[in-house]
Amino acid sequence: MFRTIRKKKNEISINKSVIYLIIAIPTIVFTIWDLFCGSIQIRCNDRDFNIEAKGWNDYTGEYSQIDSISYEVNVLQNDNDHRTNGFGNLKYAMGNFNNDIFGDYIRYTHASCHSYVVMNIDGKILVVNGENDAETKEIYQRISEKVSKERK
């Protein structure tokens, strides 16, 4: 009788371990995947630009609505910058943010790059960048050229 009880306890213990593994493995995989998922693609069209963001809402801005555009370095490296709504992980920051420099603003940035294109669009600040400084400069030049043509 004691062997039967001991055997049932071992079976229950094994069943618990299997259940814990079934729960733990997907949780770990999801957590790791979530830390690195997402993407940001900026496409310049004739009259507007599109930000296609996997992990957050896409954004479309018209060149005619851009009041100012600038290329900035290390402008977001401040302790008071925080996300108020959006998506962020080890690679990307997307959504609505707030800091001492811009107040409330919209951001689509790669964590690997510390240069930014800052645009004032109808009174709202939009901050974007590429994966590196060269890609960010290219984004700035393309949008600046389109804004200049739109203003002529």
List where the protein language model places each region.
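Terminal and domain-flanking low-complexity segments
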Residues: 2-4, 75, 111-152
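Compositionally biased, intrinsically disordered low-complexity segments
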Residues: 5-8, 17, 69, 90, ...
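Non-transmembrane, membrane-adjacent beta-strand/coil modules in membrane-associated proteins
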Residues: 52-63, 68-122
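Alpha-helical transmembrane signal-anchor/signal-peptide segments
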Residues: 37-51
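Short low-complexity stretches enriched in small and charged residues
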Residues: 17-28, 45, 73-87
